[in-house]
Amino acid sequence: MSKILAKLPTEMRGELKDPLGEIYTDTDELLADAGDPLVAVGDIVTYHLLEAGHRPAAAIVDGKTERERVERKVLSAIEEFDERIDVANPQSTITDDLLEALSTALDRPDPTVVVVDGEEDLASLPAVVAAPVGASVVYGQPGEGMVLVHVTDETQAECRDIIERMQSDYSQIESILS
């Protein structure tokens, strides 16, 4: 059973509405600026990358967009990944299973999709912490587009700080991601 290692407190919800990077509406422009490996968080973002001919090294999806089920064509495209890991991760949380799956996906030589039963909305934070410097993480910004986060020491520190300020067991999170 999954153990919740971080929970987003209500008072921090507004803070996470600000994008961590530049917003793109054109997938090709995003891909031209993205580092390698590329991690995608969200079904629609992953779908757009796949439609543009790019399979991210790791994708984290939950079968929903803005809490509604995604269209069948999106699910079908995502099912094309050769490697798949299924995890449970309740809304507004980060679980040990999600972190272990993210770490495993980044270590695999083949692109891997992590399918979340629950919600993946906070997964971009540990993805930035776990990805190597020089990589990129892309996630959806509802109603605006795709946010591209370049993984640097600074963006990792920013995401680490956000996770630490959540109701979290950061030492355990760090031990899984390192």
From Swiss-Prot:
Coiled coil: none
Protein name: GTP-dependent dephospho-CoA kinase
InterPro entries: GTP-dep_dephospho-CoA_kin
Keywords annotated in UniProt: Coenzyme A biosynthesis, GTP-binding, Kinase, Nucleotide-binding, Transferase
Enzyme class, UniProt record, top EC level: transferase
EC number of the protein: 2.7.1.237
GO molecular function, one term: kinase activity
Reactions the enzyme catalyzes: 3'-dephospho-CoA + GTP = GDP + CoA + H(+)
